Amino acid sequence: MHYSRKWPTNNVRCPGTPYTAKLRVIKNQRQTTEQRKDMVNWDVIVIGSGIGGLTAAVGLSNLGKRVLVLEQHYLPGGWTHSFSLEGHKFSPGVHYVGQLNEGGRTREIFEGLGVGGDLEFLELHPDGYDHIVFKDETFDIPAGLEKYIARLIERFPDERSGIVGYFKLMKQVDRGLTMAADIKGIFDKLKLLLTCPAIVFNGLKPASQIIDRFITDAKLKTILEVRAGDHGMSPARVPFALHVAIEAHYWNGGWYPKGGASAMPKALIGRLKCNDGEIRMRTTVDHILVDGNGADRRAVGVQLADGKQIRAETVLSNADAWITYDKLIDRRHLSDAITSRISKLEPSISALSLFLATDLDIDALGLDSGNYWIMNEADVDATYRLAEDGQLAAEGAFPGGFLTVTTRKDESKMHDGLHTMEAFVFVSYTAFERWKESATGDRSEDYEAFKEQLTQRMLKMISRVVPNIENHLKLCELGTPLTNVFYCNGHRGNIYGTAKSKSQIGAGVLPIKTEITGLYHCGQSTAAHGVLGAMATGVMAAQQIANCRHDEVLAFAEEGKITLS
């Protein structure tokens, strides 16, 4: 099947009429934006423009559904948004993306949605896309699993057998995760048990327990545990299966979207608009409209903060679990079971985010496009003990943190010849809760003083990698968990949705299809987090809403391939 193409003036590729045998062809007569805004009914309303919601929106619009996305922020993308400060561009939620190699899952989704040709990704330093910075040395993690294993053995020769055994188990569990994704019944579960017992018997055990089984060297344990920051749970708590999923995601290296994280929602929104879909910014949903009672409950649309009602056959919430169930749905429409479940739900970790612009000579410092995991002590769990401390001290060294030189990843982001950096430290929302009722930009002097003290602590940590940074700053701005609440509407400033603990993954995840007919849920509070995880939940939501197969949602790869540079 060949599609005619219309090329819009904004250089976003606009394919012609999408097709599927299961659903109707979109009308040839395109409606104007003004007419679309006057429509009484949509097929699907998506609440929130995070990457999961946009994935579902594009998938459904490709299949002929009329989709409206409503976003409370003035920037689309949720944690994949980018913003500017004094002309410098920052992307707080995306620092690298994996599985963009041929056959990679992330690539499959972007290309399958028909937006591959609109995206270019830049490879992080292949000989060290992640740098683990100790006080006395730096260990570089290279792209390619076998290269990584060989480098570990070279650095820790006495741990050779443990390293080999550990990665053998990781490969087995990774294979089991692939199989587990296709489980549909008891026979599939039995097949998984028989063919991949490694995941059955190890998947829910704490990652640190598995690592301790194979490894004795404290520094090596740190290297194997430190990227827990990519899922935000202590190695002592995170299920090994999730730890493997995150590690395996980057076995072939990492990439960064050219133009910043916002390039991804931009491509998806361009496709959505070409399919007669629409996104409305600064549009806050007050609540979801539900008709009927008991088993007859059905979502029929939304009511906005200004009182306007918009009707739709289906509503998909891309908001987090607490916003969705505690704020958008009237309690009388929820069962006691789901109400109790939400009340016990644990949010993921929060963080401080430091955004910098500097006139330092980055070349002279030898900094590259890789990420820097800075460890002041070898105990990775100390990072998470700090994050659980509601009495966050204003002074002292952070046990660990994360730094990225974003203009090294994408030189097109340079402004006025300055380099930009982003740094992050996990902290507790509780330490900032006393200021939660104050307005952003109008908070008290003690809040601003606390921020300044924390900024200095972070700069001291960063100076291990970037000496004299504090004397070469042209821009320095700190975001707190309250910033996360304001811009991303995340419960208690969480950055990964629900905590992916033993009780909240696998069978414990919140469902895509809710107990209310016509109401669905996707994003980081459901099955998975991160760019790929959230997109995967969007694909699952589109499948269930359209009642179609996975390959039908991702049937548009011929529209173009991702460029890797």
What positions do the PLM features span?
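A conserved FAD-binding loop/helix module that cradles the flavin
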Residues: 526-545
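Rossmann-like flavin
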Residues: 134-238
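C-terminal segments that line or cap access tunnels to active or ligand-binding sites in enzymes
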Residues: 360-479
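Helical element adjacent to the flavin cofactor pocket in flavoenzyme catalytic cores
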Residues: 244-299
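N-terminal glycine-rich phosphate/pyrophosphate-binding loop and immediately adjacent elements
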Residues: 38-172, 498-499
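A glycine-rich dinucleotide-binding beta-alpha-beta segment and adjacent secondary-structure elements
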Residues: 217-231, 398-404, 459, 463-528
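Active-site-proximal substrate-binding core of FAD-dependent oxidoreductases
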Residues: 290, 547-565
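Mid-domain catalytic core of redox enzymes
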Residues: 256, 286-415, 562
